Amino acid sequence: MSSLKKILGLKGKGKKSKKLGIAPPPYEEDTSMEYAPSAPIDKSYFGVDEMDTHDPNQLRYEKFFFTVKLTVRSNRPFRTYSDVAAAVSHWDHMYIGMAGKRPFYKILAFLGSSNLKATPAVLADQGQPEYHAHCEGRAYLPHRMGKTPPMLNVPEHFRRPFNIGLYKGTIELTMTIYDDESLEAAPMIWDHFNSSKFSDFREKALMFGLIVEKKASGAWILDSVSHFK
């Protein structure tokens, strides 16, 4: 996790990252069930005596490099951004990937959807409507998600079908996100969005399973992730 000093570009004695790398899981492997803790963790249990506990009120800052490439193919042109968001938000259906990166991937999918541009019909595959987005850069995210896991420079690719009302097609999404341990300042991740595509940011974020709140300063923070999306 990056300190606030690093995010704001303030000088200070840098520390080596203690995060360790982990390889992505095989995407072909099926999982029979998903589960979540149903009771508070007992400190007497093995391995949890020095575990970093999650304080839902603690505001943290994560700084990172990111790349997102998004291609959406549909049977008909989208009329509104709400139609686009409804389709793209299905990217993590039956998610198999790095669990710790999933909230950040949700943000990148949301970001990519806001920057989609239609491909000229003459260039589209078999004349079907196609939309593409490619965004990359550095950013930081204020959040209340607790301590984040190691994030190494490992791209992950997702391909999902969608069938939403009148629209059906495929989503292809390639994302990379990894820790930025530099002391250079970075913009907030929300600054990379094309906000002209929608008016209600909180509502559209929720379509991607992101619960956001606005600070007194007017900046958005990621408060939590919805378990229903």
Swiss-Prot record:
Keywords: Apoptosis, Eukaryotic host gene expression shutoff by virus, Host cytoplasm, Host gene expression shutoff by virus, Host membrane, Host mRNA suppression by virus, Host nucleus, Host-virus interaction, Inhibition of host mRNA nuclear export by virus, Membrane, Phosphoprotein, Viral budding, Viral budding via the host ESCRT complexes, Viral matrix protein, Viral release from host cell, Virion. Phosphorylated by host. GO terms for cellular component: host cell cytoplasm; host cell nuclear membrane; membrane; viral envelope. A motif (PPXY motif) lies at residues 24-27. Residues 1-23 are annotated as: Disordered. GO terms for biological process: symbiont-mediated suppression of host mRNA export from nucleus; symbiont-mediated suppression of host transcription initiation from RNA polymerase II promoter; viral budding via host ESCRT complex. Pfam families: Vesiculo_matrix. Its main location: virion. Gene3D superfamilies: VSV matrix protein. Disulfide bonds: none annotated. A motif (PTAP/PSAP motif) lies at residues 37-40. It comes from the Viruses. It is a peripheral membrane protein. It is found in: Virion; Host endomembrane system; Host nucleus membrane; Host nucleus. Residues 1-10 have a biased composition (Low complexity). A motif (dynamin binding) lies at residues 2-4. One of its GO terms (molecular function) is structural constituent of virion. The keyword Glycoprotein does not apply. VSV is used as an oncolytic agent for cancer therapy, because of his wide host range, rapid replication and mild pathogenicity in humans. VSV used are mutated at M51R in their matrix protein. These mutated viruses cannot successfully infect normal cells, being unable to counteract the antiviral state induced by interferon-alpha in normal cells. Cancer cells are impeded with responsiveness to interferon, and then can be successfully infected and lysed by the virus. Belongs to the vesiculoviruses matrix protein family. Forms a double layer around the helical nucleocapsid, the inner matrix layer binding to the N helix and the outer matrix layer binding to the envelope glycoprotein. Plays a major role in assembly and budding of virion, by recruiting cellular partners of the ESCRT complexes that play a key role in releasing the budding particle from the host membrane. Condensates the ribonucleocapsid core during virus assembly. Late-budding domains (L domains) are short sequence motifs essential for viral particle budding. They recruit proteins of the host ESCRT machinery (Endosomal Sorting Complex Required for Transport) or ESCRT-associated proteins. M contains two overlapping L domains: a PPXY motif which interacts with the WW domain 3 of NEDD4 and a PTAP/PSAP motif, which interacts with the UEV domain of TSG101. Homomultimer. Interacts with viral nucleocapsid; this interaction contributes to the virion assembly. Interacts with the viral envelope glycoprotein; this interaction contributes to the virion assembly. Interacts with host RAE1-NUP98 complex. Interacts with host NEDD4 and TSG101. Interacts with host dynamin. Interacts with host NDUFAF4; the interaction inhibits viral propagation and is independent of interferon activation. Interacts with host GTF2H5; the interaction may inhibit host transcription. This is Matrix protein. It comes from Vesicular stomatitis Indiana virus (strain 98COE North America). The lineage of its organism: Viruses, Riboviria, Orthornavirae, Negarnaviricota, Haploviricotina.
